[in-house]
Amino acid sequence: MNTNSKELLTETPFKIMLKLSVPAIIGMMVIGLYPLMDGIFAGQLLGQDAMTAIGVSMPFTYFNTGIATLIGVGSSSILSRAIGENNKDTFKKIMNNLLFWVLILSLIITILGVIFSKKLLSLIGAEGTILDLANRYLTIIFTGSLFVNFAQSANMLLRGEGLMKKAMVIMTLGAGLNIILDPLLMIAMRNIDRGIEGAAIATILAQIVQAFVTYYYFKYKSNTIKIEKIKKEITISKEVFAVGVSAMLMQVLTIIQQSILYSQAFRYGGDEAGSIMAATLRIMAFSFIPLWGMSQGLQPAIGTNFGAKEYIRVKHIFKIFLLSSILLAAIFWIPAMLFTENLLSLFGLSNTTLINGTLYFRIFYSVFLGYGIMIMTLTFFQAIGDAKSAGNLVIMRQIVIFVPAMIILPMFLGLNAIWVTPPIIDIFIIVISIFLYIKTIKKFK
């Protein structure tokens, strides 16, 4: 057990929260720069069509995100508990298993993605020049799936080991390289009408570098985990999939959720509602990243102490993270609710749209203050290996309740239902999350 892991069992919960969460939050914010910078540079250097093409491609990049999250979160949860138990056998097997599944699943994503990328883009309405540009961009992204998925999933394993700063530095390296390469390759390749390919290649090259740096660390530097061979470990694999599936579902089901939000907004409110929804979801996504980063800090803290059967510390750590997540959410929620019109105006909305958008945004964003509760409880269940509770929460929120409610209620209540329904659903899920957490900790002995 390394020094970082021992500290998870001895440091005060507040110090653990600061040590693990700050680097994780910064690291997650860095990850958020990839799609953001691609879009900004494409719009400035290649034009509106290129920016739109990258935008419509983004939902399908969640296939890779889902795979990386499935393997990374599942493996990270197992590792954290193994550290608490000092299970050296798991230390030897965890990376071999991760490499096996990254290789197999990335190969599947690459083949299917390249074959069906154009059809997928057509399904969401891309056509003409935008369809052509988006297909050229997305095909390259799918081709680099192996490097993307290894870089991201192995980084989660670093966090599971409690090495948040190291994980952050490696992610920052990848993001920084992407930001540098993006404009350079777009400018260099736009003269041969391949600027959009330059954007995709920049992203993949950055991930390749991050993947090789990560590989080097685990191969030669890590004191806990070593890369020995590519091998499926049946026992570990079952638990990786059981635990990781709920985290993967959050990524993949977001595609379904956002597709319904957009389609219903356009159907009942036209282009104006669609524009408001686009601005609102961008703000929500940006606000969500720090909470997700904090949850990455919670996972090894809970997992390690749970594995060591330090149940009182598990409760104290969760309490500190929960309260901190509410405070973190408030940092975004308060200014967003006070300066809504100024915030929405950054997205170029017209004055008329801003009048309606201000009210709709405040309704939609109203429950964000409680998002930390929802995310921390979900991460808690993942960390202790309770895949059933974690999976049920995700499926209940994003499919079972959300889909029928968003389809049926607007039929009777019109456009207003599209903005009111999601926060009501979130309140319900937050209450259920708290109930399941209390029920679970009562079983700790």
Language model: regions and residue ranges:
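Short alpha-helical transmembrane segments in multi-pass integral membrane proteins
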Residues: M1-S21, L79-G144, N191-V245, I302-V367, ...
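N-terminal transmembrane alpha-helices
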Residues: L8-L45, P59-G74, I78, L103-T110, ...
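Transmembrane helical elements of multi-pass membrane transporters/channels
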Residues: K19-D38, I140, G174, A206-Q210, ...
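Residue-level hotspots within pore-lining transmembrane alpha-helices
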Residues: V30, Y34, N64-A68, I108, ...
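Helix-terminus/linker motif at the lipid-water interface of multi-pass membrane proteins
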Residues: L33-M51, L121-G128, L184-R194, I255-F286, ...
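Small-residue-rich hydrophobic transmembrane alpha-helices
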Residues: M51-I111, V148-A167, I276-I334, L338-T340, ...
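Hydrophobic transmembrane alpha-helices of multi-pass small-molecule transporters
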Residues: F63-G66, N178-P183, A211-Y215, A285-I289, ...
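Short runs within selected transmembrane alpha-helices of multi-pass transporters and secretion channels
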Residues: G72, I141-R159, A167-A175, A199-T214, ...
